[in-house]
Amino acid sequence: MTFLTRYEELRAIKQEFAARDWFPGTSGNLAIRTNSSPTEFLVTASGKDKRQDTPDDFVHVDATGQLIGEQNGRPSAETLLHVEVFNRTTAGCSLHVHTVDNNVISELYGDRGEIRFRSQEIIKALGRWEEDAEVIVPIITNHADIPTLAADFAKHIRTESGAVLIRNHGITVWAPTAFEAKKQLEAFEFLFSYTLKLQACRQAIY
């Protein structure tokens, strides 16, 4: 695909997530691979209101997260997370959002270091079709130092698709294509919301 196609794919995801209010306080960042050798990708520019569309919404960076040539804006503060994804896998897209549900889930299960899901139909959206399929999402500490956070995050990048929760921060999901990454992020957010609502209902009943 061309650079422009990748740009439009990422812009469409940004618009859709903005409509869902998944970018509170300018949080969150999105990235899509534009080249594999050498690794290059588009990533959301830092500090911008992602509910607005401007010509400078994304910047083009190299395998270390540095700007390629002169550009307006600078890469998102968490670009190093996407650097780890694109350098360690052939994934084509990496998405990071802060939602209330993923933050609450990460705090509730943070001491366990993971959350597990099974017996949910939407797990199939994650590519798991077995009758007893189980999905495990690791939960890591929210290090203020981004290189430290990225190093901890990188320990859980083992496949071309995956997800990691950062405690009281957000989730990063990556997959081979933008479509797959968006689909999987939607599935995880569904599972988080379902889990929280189910727990609340059980407490109300019992």
Curated annotation (Swiss-Prot):
GO biological process, one term: L-methionine salvage from methylthioadenosine
EC number: 4.2.1.109
Cofactor(s) named in the record: Zn(2+)
Free-text remark on how the cofactor is bound: Binds 1 zinc ion per subunit.
Pathway: Amino-acid biosynthesis; L-methionine biosynthesis via salvage pathway; L-methionine from S-methyl-5-thio-alpha-D-ribose 1-phosphate: step 2/6
Residues at which Zn(2+) binds: 96, 98
GO cellular component: cytoplasm
Keywords: Amino-acid biosynthesis, Lyase, Metal-binding, Methionine biosynthesis, Zinc
Pfam family, any one: Aldolase_II
Gene3D superfamilies for the chain: Class II aldolase/adducin N-terminal domain
Reactions mediated catalytically: 5-(methylsulfanyl)-D-ribulose 1-phosphate = 5-methylsulfanyl-2,3-dioxopentyl phosphate + H2O
GO MF term set: methylthioribulose 1-phosphate dehydratase activity; zinc ion binding
Record function comment: Catalyzes the dehydration of methylthioribulose-1-phosphate (MTRu-1-P) into 2,3-diketo-5-methylthiopentyl-1-phosphate (DK-MTP-1-P).
Family designation: Belongs to the aldolase class II family. MtnB subfamily.
Protein name per the record: Methylthioribulose-1-phosphate dehydratase
